[in-house]
């Protein structure tokens, strides 16, 4: 670049720096504006195709979900009053309606020792054997001589944690006595907790040995400090299904009706059974159909925005979508719409309109909820046949979309091409900057040379004038 001392025209009087800057800017501006437009348009298209690809992928996800046969094989179970029981079902359950009456809930064992005086300590060491059920091998816990009731409790809980039995102290503020209370883990008849103390620790006993050598348990008499026994006895749940009397060791019943699990909550009113209903999971299918419609409508909305021209006022230029005139986008929607009106192989439900899904003027889908509910209730298998399988609607729609979203597909090729264009803009801008810099250097040199030439001409002119003035006979005019 020319030396800065030569930028202003000393001899010519010209502002060379400003002249060169103006000429360079005039040369650069059109190309720079062209590159900016190209970069802006390309970036908008790149973003638009990314949005389109995302919308298509979302739609494909729900298409694949609706094409899964297991979606239509699912079963749902419900009860007429969840205050008394709740129910769930697997695909193995057969549709049906059952009457359930609950007369007794399953319960875990809760037992208590006789009362211990305030400040009690064991007089001798020994062992306590705790069993859950008379036939249980039990857990033996060592108790040291002089142990407080709290220390005995802590030793018990440390040894019983794997068995799930817990020991707590309940104090009587009236007389200062305390009892050890044991709570079992497992519900069901025969799961009562028994405690047997070795010699010197018999006051911890809960349950007695009968004449046959078996343990028996009596109910605790809360008014007697010497009484031990059960507060709550371990019991089976008792209930009936359609009049058949049944029992379960837990309140979770899963082997009475194939594929159905129900959770008993409380005893039902006498002679007022509740209803358990097992049916196809119509709610789950409907939710997925709604997701399909939402995803399709999102795709329509995205394409409309990207390909539309929106007026914003008489005095303003319209808003033009990034993909206006893009044939691939138009072809995508046209292909989808054509596929959706092709009849399926079924007889009752052959297309979306048969189940209450129709196309609005703007190209989006809408659902007639009442019609859809009725079709799902009366023609569930026909809906499954329309949607699923290699020739089902969901697979056909997915096949139309795959060429656009697959690796190396239509949209990926477009994105790659646009990325190349963005890179080329950067390359062209670098080349333009180099040309402009070269032009600026050249113009500065040319204008500097011109200014120097003018200086030389001025000097020559001055010398000639001086020489002429000194010639003989030359008379100067006054």
Swiss-Prot record:
InterPro entries associated with the record: Flagellin_hook_IN_motif, FliD, FliD_C, FliD_N
Cellular localization per UniProt: Secreted; Bacterial flagellum
GO terms, biological process: bacterial-type flagellum-dependent cell motility; cell adhesion
UniProt keyword terms in alphabetical order: Bacterial flagellum, Coiled coil, Secreted
Pfam families from the UniProt entry: Flagellin_IN (PF07196), FliD_C (PF07195), FliD_N (PF02465)
Cellular component terms per the entry's GO annotation: bacterial-type flagellum filament cap; bacterial-type flagellum hook; extracellular region
Primary subcellular site in the record, as a coarse category: secreted
Coiled-coil boundaries: 409-460
Superkingdom assignment: Bacteria
The protein's assembly and partners: Homopentamer.
Family: Belongs to the FliD family.
Function: Required for the morphogenesis and for the elongation of the flagellar filament by facilitating polymerization of the flagellin monomers at the tip of growing filament. Forms a capping structure, which prevents flagellin subunits (transported through the central channel of the flagellum) from leaking out without polymerization at the distal end. Essential for motility. Responsible for adhesion to mucin, which is the initial event in colonization by this organism of the airways of cystic fibrosis patients.
UniProt protein name: A-type flagellar hook-associated protein 2
Organism listed in the record: Pseudomonas aeruginosa
Gene name of this polypeptide: fliD
